[in-house]
Amino acid sequence: MEVGVFIPIGNNGWLISENSPQYQPSFDLNKEIAQRAEAHGLDFLLSMIKLRGFGGKTEFWEYNLESFTLMAGLASVTERIKLFATCATLLIPPAYAARMCNTIDSISHGRFGLNLITGWQRPEYSQMGMWPGDEHFARRYDMLSEYAHILRELWEKGESSFQGEFYQMEDCRVRPQPQGDMKLICAGSSDAGLAFSAKYADYAFCLGKGVNTPTAFAGNNERLAAATAKTGRDVSIYVLMMVIAAETDDEAMDKWMHYRAGVDEEAVAWLGNQGAADKTSDTTNVRQLAARESAVNLNMGTLVGSYENIARMLDEVATVPNTGGVLLVFDDFVAGVETFGTRIQPLMKTRQHTAG
């Protein structure tokens, strides 16, 4: 099973709490995380793109770096680990995105891939006059399908004359082509999102669910399997999990409860309001992000416990059919990656190939 890190491109990582570590994103922080992850044999890094945060006392995600340029920088200071940026497709035309990808492919010598998002938080785009209207919610995967088609053409052939509803190419040329096998990721969990992944993506990301329930996401894999049965493609799931680890279960749980006690209610309320804006689907992952149950960390799957129990639960993740890997976030990223590499990974049956 592959293991990657969802690096903290935004302030405070993925904990919306006054009691969690408070920090700003920086290249130096992410460089240290990237190099430690590579040294411990982890497989990939992914950075998101967030253009406006949730506010509140913690100003959650109000401070963010940009995904492509951050990953270009990290490509120059790493040697083996795979790198994925996230593309805000409402802002960046597909031909320009293809050229940026080709450039980072050159910097990284074939280690780069791209995560495509449609955009769901209206204020991110309306603040700069780029929100296409709420009808976007119903048509966003139609748009993204054209986007992905153009990317594939440009990467494979170096040119495209695709004529669609959303994009029109006229003898568009993007060269040199990438030296690596450019992989596409999508994180959509709605029926439309999974149908898109089944047709265009190489990997599909999903949110884990619950606290210490490492296989609770299995239903998402089953839904994707039904979608890929129609396309005949092999698309594996990578599941997002937060790890809060300590020497003992009690110590780890104390940290988790402390973070929960400090939840930034104002920021969580903003998330809830934005998550309710899409009226077209009940299966979108934004519904899970904004649910009240564990909004302190956007309701992602959370593994809390001793190093031994975290290792056991991560191995359980790998037992879910069609799971290709896990994408990890930590309460403290530098310490978390180091602890994972030295105390957790050596205990995992699915990571024994990294030993020594």
UniProtKB/Swiss-Prot annotation:
InterPro entries: Luciferase-like_dom (IPR011251), Luciferase-like_sf (IPR036661), Pyrimidine_monooxygenase_RutA (IPR019914), SsuD_RutA_monooxygenase (IPR050172)
E.C. number(s) listed in UniProt: 1.14.99.46
Catalytic activity: uracil + FMNH2 + NADH + O2 = (Z)-3-ureidoacrylate + FMN + NAD(+) + H2O + H(+); thymine + FMNH2 + NADH + O2 = (Z)-2-methylureidoacrylate + FMN + NAD(+) + H2O + H(+)
Annotated SUPFAM superfamilies: Bacterial luciferase-like
Residue intervals passing through the bilayer: none
GO molecular function: alkanesulfonate monooxygenase activity; uracil oxygenase activity
Any one Gene Ontology BP term: nitrogen utilization
Entry keywords, A to Z: Flavoprotein, FMN, Monooxygenase, NADP, Oxidoreductase
Pfam families per the UniProt record, alphabetical: Bac_luciferase
Record keyword Flavoprotein present: yes
CDD domains, alphabetized: Alkanesulfonate_monoxygenase
UniProt keyword annotation of Oxidoreductase present: yes
Sites where the protein binds FMN: 49-50, 115, 124, 140-141, 190
NCBIfam families given in the database record: RutA (TIGR03612)
Family: Belongs to the NtaA/SnaA/DszA monooxygenase family. RutA subfamily.
Role description: The FMN-N(5)-oxide reacts spontaneously with NADH to produce FMN. Requires the flavin reductase RutF to regenerate FMN in vivo.
Protein name as annotated: Pyrimidine monooxygenase RutA
Origin: domain of life: Bacteria
